[in-house]
Amino acid sequence: PLLQSREVRKKPLQRTFFGQRWVIWRDARQEVVLQSDRCPHLGAALSLGQVREGLITCPFHGFAFDGSGTCKKAPAIGSAVVPSHHLRLQTPLVRDYQGFIWLWHGDPNLATETPPFFEDLLQGWSYGTIDSDWPVHLTRAIENQLDVAHLPFVHANTIGKGHKTLVEGPYVEKDDQEIRVWVSNQKDHGQRPRTLESLALAAKERRPELVFKFPGIWLLNISPKLKLLVAFVP
C-alpha cells in the first residue's frame, strides 16, 4: 500500500515513493491513477495542474493525459492534430481496495485482481487511522513488528504488561504469503522455556498474535474485538 484512499480527492496529490515523484488523482470514473509527476513535454509538475474532463492537465502548456498515460490534448498544435505517442506518462498499475491505494510493482500481466489482505478485516469493523513517519529503513520497521523480546520494555503498560521477559520460542509459521507469530512470553521464575514442539501444539488452539502479509501489511490480534493494522509504505 502507498497511502489511504481518503487522501486522494478532487485535486491531484504529489507523493514520493522509491525516490521518485508521483502524482495521484482520480479520473472521471473516480478510479485512482498513479503517474510520474513530470510532464514529458518540458518537465512541469502535473500535481500542480488540475483534473478536467477526466484528464490531468499540465499547468504549463495545458497538455492533458488520461489514466493510461496517453496524451489526449496538446493545445498548441490544435485539436485537429493527434499528439505524439512519445508524450506518455509512466503509469504503474494501482488498486483502490479496503481503504488503501495499492501499487503492483511488477509485470501487470501477473497482477492479482485484489491485493493481499486479512480476511478477518474484510467487513464489520469500525476503525480509525493515523499516519506516522518512522526514520528507519522499511526492513527495520517490519523486523521490529515481528520482534517479541522488546514488548515488556517498550510496551510495558499495554501489550507488554506483566513484565514477561522470558521469550518462549516464539513459535513461527511461514509460507510464500505471510509470516505468523505466536507470542508466548512468560514471567521469569528460573524455569526453562517450553520446547518448540510444545509451543506448536499450543498454537493449534489459538490464533497467532502477529501476522505479516507480504509485501507490507501487519496485523496484531490484541483481542477478538480489537486489532491493530500497520501498512508499511516505502
Question: Residue spans of the language-model regions?
Answer:
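Helix N-cap / beta->alpha transition motif
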Residues: P1-Q4, H137
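Rieske [2Fe-2S] iron-sulfur-binding domain
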Residues: L3-L122, K227
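C-terminal catalytic domain of Rieske-type non-heme iron oxygenases
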Residues: E31, N109-P234
